């Protein structure tokens, strides 16, 4: 008993002794390179949650330390260090900068460059910064994330693409799309049927986007890069010593309708027709109150499953991924099912002198297209039922007294969906084989060969039911049409790179020279079967264009402070005729100064980066719609338009094709953009605050434009070089990490872009009274104009007159030239589609295993032409005596009955489309070592997209890339719930 008592007393004595044995340790954390203190360093006892962080002066105090504890010091951009506590009360730590971080490379044209050696305006968005909740379209990943770049959805259909603009584009009528390169292969626009040529890339396979904005960065790609370049790099396998890495990412998405067009309901419609219509029209009214938009719209469900396997050793690694997407549309019957497969294999031989990289990406998109739209639902009589006994599938249709369909009458939108089967099967594959060899006898010299391909085929079919009103004139058979298209894109790139570090001069020389060849081919067949099973077959096979280029680039880096870059490219195209017009040059030059490496800033504890950049470059453009606009051509007729010249002895008719001489312009030449850029990259407090400032000016000459031809010409229009255009802007970006501890990290980021475009010269005509060129026509009128001194696509409109109550007076416009006549001479330039400035900002909060993010986006100064409301008038309802059509509730405000064609050109319909959107909110939780299995992590997440929009615009969505709102496919609000599993 005495022994037990003594033992118990001894144990009780040990408990407080062990408590008092815990100690505190303090010290200072500095940068080993310059001796400056580092604030915000994470200091933690490994295996515990006991930790602290260094203060602004690098000082720290860590309590509760026991002998043998391992203390870890870590900070972004530095190599972590560990110390075993042995009783000392002070530990001072000098962290070394992470060489891998210092040597971080950025993918640019034909190679890569150390981030610190960049001289151009280049932005990289990595997977950590992607927008959340994206299923089908990769371009959505970077929407609003980069200054100077706009990404506007073309609509909300499954797999819908976007209109991407870098610094506002450079052209009026030629392409303004950036060049998109995936793992070294420039993409070609897809064939008909596909909604987005990026859909062959699974968003889950993307590692990063690199955006090249100024001409010094893009000129190496020549004329294809006049509107900027987006380089997509996909994920690769890593060296895991043969261990297999598995990832599964799956989610389910629920989509709902955010808004609808405000159409007259059944009661409002009956009231209007009763008050204003004839007795025959009143007799047409039904008794229903049908919301036709509700009849064709639905809430949708989508699923997305992605699996990837990767592994590797020092000499070989690989990654294989499979994606399965099933996405319903908001319009009934609209559906996309996509299967994607991606494979990457990287090998190294001969002591890393030979590297071979193989990429293959394949996707099959199976579309079921909705065969009606919101506009059709808007215009159908809301007093009629969906169904009615008749010979047209028992859907209500406008019929005459004999039960026949009335010509030109609107079709029941539900019947248009159900009685049409429209499908598309898109196959797309792209890949490349890249061989990189570093010469043994001269290791500074590398040869790189890149052979790539892109093949896209589309088969689209449409079957219209025999009892559809669309087949009313046919003989009881279904109508059928099919289109087969194929596009091929073949690439051959070769370059030599020589990089020499001359230590005696503290200078690095980097020189690249190479050759590029790309060929495009279109082929296909159009087939239709309709009246009495007559079959029409129309094959085609057209070489589209061939592109040749020789390029070179030289970079000199002196003491990591002064970097000079120059590039030159010589290109040829088959679009233009004559050697003088077929060839063009793309020179560029740039200089950057890493001021933070100067002695007067090297020891600064405030400034961690300060880089000044200046650049100049020229990039041409040739992507006008016609593939051969400079060559004389004859258009031969299709089989339906052949001319019979006689017959064979057996009576078989003999046909020959007719021909039409097409207009051409042998003097057509390159559109050329010269760009100037001044930039600043900065970082403060060891990168806790960072950002960039860029000022740019783009001057485009010899604008390519499809312009109207004089009367008597063989065609109404032809391609010409007609004038000059300028675009200038200011881009600002800022990223701040206000809090960074072991358990809590808060990041704030944002960007804003101010932009201004102006047509500076039009020289296609010699007429001082010439108003300008038009490129958006409707109902015999025009709304967008290109004219000197104003922004591209400015609105050309009448000035509406209003009464004392602010109600527009029908057909009344200001006589601006005071000649007592209202005609086109009274129109004026009013507003523009492009924003004065646009912005995006986000916040990310990580607390232990929780992750929260929120992203906002907006624009100011952009105006839309609301063509939906412009068509709202009483005559639209009462135009015929045997049918009725609906319109929007704007009729109740304007009370317009007709107003003539001039109504469409009223500034009443030019509306402020500025907006602020809460694009997405995401919340996730990660289970580390899930179910106590080591190296298995599971993340559960939820994301809401298209959360909130604040705008004065009266349409269903203010984001219209062209500014011309003629109803779009509604963009849904989505709720996504998913799981990500790694082991």
List PLM regions with ranges:
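Glycine-rich, aromatic-lined ligand/substrate-binding cores of catalytic
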Residues: 833-865
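Extended ligand-binding clefts on enzyme/binding-domain cores
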Residues: 184, 789-792, 797, 803
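Short aromatic-centered micro-motifs
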Residues: 31, 43, 73, 180, ...
């Amino acid at each position: 008993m005495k022994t037990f008592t003594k033992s118990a007393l001894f144990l009780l004595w040990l408990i407080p002794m062990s408590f008092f044995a815990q100690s505190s340790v303090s010290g200072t954390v500095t940068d080993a390179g310059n001796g400056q203190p580092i604030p915000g360093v994470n200091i933690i006892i490994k295996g515990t949650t006991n930790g602290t962080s260094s203060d602004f002066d690098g000082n720290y105090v860590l309590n509760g330390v026991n002998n043998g504890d391992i203390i870890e010091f870590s900070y972004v951009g530095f190599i972590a260090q560990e110390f075993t506590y042995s009783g000392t009360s002070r530990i001072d730590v000098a962290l070394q900068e992470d060489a891998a971080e210092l040597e971080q490379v950025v993918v640019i044209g034909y190679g890569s460059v150390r981030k610190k050696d960049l001289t151009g305006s280049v932005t990289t968005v990595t997977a950590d910064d992607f927008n959340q909740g994206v299923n089908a379209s990769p371009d959505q990943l970077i929407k609003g994330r980069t200054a100077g770049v706009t990404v506007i959805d073309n609509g909300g259909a499954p797999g819908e693409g976007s209109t991407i603009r870098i610094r506002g584009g450079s052209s009026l009528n030629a392409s303004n799309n950036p060049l998109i390169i995936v793992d070294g292969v420039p993409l070609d626009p897809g064939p008909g049927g596909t909604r987005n040529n990026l859909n062959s890339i699974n968003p889950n396979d993307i590692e990063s986007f690199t955006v090249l904005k100024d001409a010094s960065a893009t000129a190496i790609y020549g004329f294809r890069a006049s509107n900027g370049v987006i380089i997509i790099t996909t994920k690769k396998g890593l060296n895991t010593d043969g261990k297999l890495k598995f990832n599964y990412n799956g989610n389910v998405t629920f989509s709902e309708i955010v808004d609808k067009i405000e159409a007259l309901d059944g009661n409002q419609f009956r009231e209007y027709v009763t008050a204003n219509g004839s007795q025959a029209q009143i007799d047409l009214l039904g008794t229903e109150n049908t919301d036709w938009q509700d009849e064709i719209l639905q809430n949708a469900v989508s699923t997305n499953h992605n699996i990837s396997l990767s592994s590797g050793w020092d000499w070989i690694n690989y990654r294989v991924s499979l994606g399965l997407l099933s996405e319903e549309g908001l319009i009934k019957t609209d559906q996309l099912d996509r299967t994607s497969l991606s494979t990457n294999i990287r090998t190294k031989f001969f002591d890393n002198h030979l590297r071979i990289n193989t990429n293959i990406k394949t996707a099959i998109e199976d579309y079921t297209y909705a065969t009606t739209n919101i506009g059709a639902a808007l215009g159908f009589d809301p007093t009629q039922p969906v169904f009615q006994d008749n010979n047209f599938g028992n859907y209500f249709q406008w019929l005459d007294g004999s039960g026949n369909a009335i010509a030109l009458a609107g079709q029941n939108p539900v019947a248009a969906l159900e009685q049409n089967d429209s499908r598309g099967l898109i196959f797309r594959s792209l890949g490349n084989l890249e061989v990189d060899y570093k010469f043994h006898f001269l290791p500074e010299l590398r040869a790189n060969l890149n052979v790539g391909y892109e093949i896209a085929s589309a088969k689209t079919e449409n079957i219209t039911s025999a009892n559809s009103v669309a087949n009313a004139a046919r003989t009881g058979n279904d109508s059928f049409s099919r289109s087969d298209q194929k596009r091929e894109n073949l690439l051959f790139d070769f370059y030599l790179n020589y990089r020499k570090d001359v230590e005696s001069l503290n200078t690095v020389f980097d020189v690249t020279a190479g050759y590029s060849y790309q060929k495009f081919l279109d082929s296909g067949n159009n087939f239709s079967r309709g009246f009495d099973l007559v079959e029409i077959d129309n094959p085609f096979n057209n070489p589209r264009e061939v592109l040749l280029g020789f390029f070179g680039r030289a970079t000199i880096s002196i003491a990591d402070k002064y970097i000079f870059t120059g590039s030159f490219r010589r290109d040829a195209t088959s679009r233009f005729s004559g050697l003088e017009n077929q060839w063009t040059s793309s020179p560029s030059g740039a200089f950057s100064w890493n001021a933070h490496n100067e002695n007067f800033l090297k020891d600064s504890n405030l400034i961690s980066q300060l880089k000044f950049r200046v650049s100049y470059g020229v990039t041409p453009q040739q992507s006008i719609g016609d593939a051969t606009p400079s060559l004389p051509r004859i258009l031969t007729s299709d089989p339906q338009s052949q001319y019979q010249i006689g017959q064979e002895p057996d009576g078989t008719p003999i046909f020959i094709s007719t021909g039409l001489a097409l207009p051409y312009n042998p003097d057509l030449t390159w559109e050329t953009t010269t760009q100037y850029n001044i930039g600043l990259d900065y970082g403060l407090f060891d990168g806790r605050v960072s950002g960039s400032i860029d000022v740019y000016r783009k001057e485009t000459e010899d604008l390519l434009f499809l312009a109207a031809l004089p009367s008597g010409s063989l065609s109404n229009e032809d391609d010409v070089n007609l004038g000059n255009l300028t675009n200038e802007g200011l881009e600002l970006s800022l990223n701040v990490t206000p809090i960074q501890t072991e358990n809590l990290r808060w990041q704030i980021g944002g960007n804003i872009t101010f932009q201004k475009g102006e047509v500076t010269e039009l020289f296609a005509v010699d007429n001082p009274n010439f108003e300008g060129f038009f490129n958006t026509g409707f109902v015999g009128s025009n709304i967008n104009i290109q004219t000197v001194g104003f922004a591209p696509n400015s609105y050309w409109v009448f000035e509406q007159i209003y009464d004392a109550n602010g109600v527009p007076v029908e057909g009344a416009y200001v006589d601006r030239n005071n000649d007592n006549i209202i005609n086109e001479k009274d129109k004026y330039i009013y507003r523009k589609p492009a924003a004065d400035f646009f912005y995006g900002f986000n916040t990310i909060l990580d607390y232990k295993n929780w992750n929260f993010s929120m992203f906002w986006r907006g624009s100011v100064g952009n105006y839309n032409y609301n063509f939906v409301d412009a068509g709202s008038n009483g005559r639209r309802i009462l135009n015929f005596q045997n049918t009725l059509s609906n319109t929007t509730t704007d009729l109740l405000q304007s009370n317009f009955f007709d107003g003539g064609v001039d109504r469409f050109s009223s500034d009443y319909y030019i509306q402020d489309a500025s907006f602020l959107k809460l694009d997405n909110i995401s919340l996730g939780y990660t289970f580390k070592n899930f179910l106590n299995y080591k190296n298995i992590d599971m993340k559960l997440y939820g994301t809401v997209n298209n959360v909130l929009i604040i705008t004065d615009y009266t349409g269903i969505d203010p984001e219209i890339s062209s500014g011309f709102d003629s109803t779009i496919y509604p963009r849904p609000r989505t709720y996504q719930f998913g799981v990500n599993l790694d082991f």
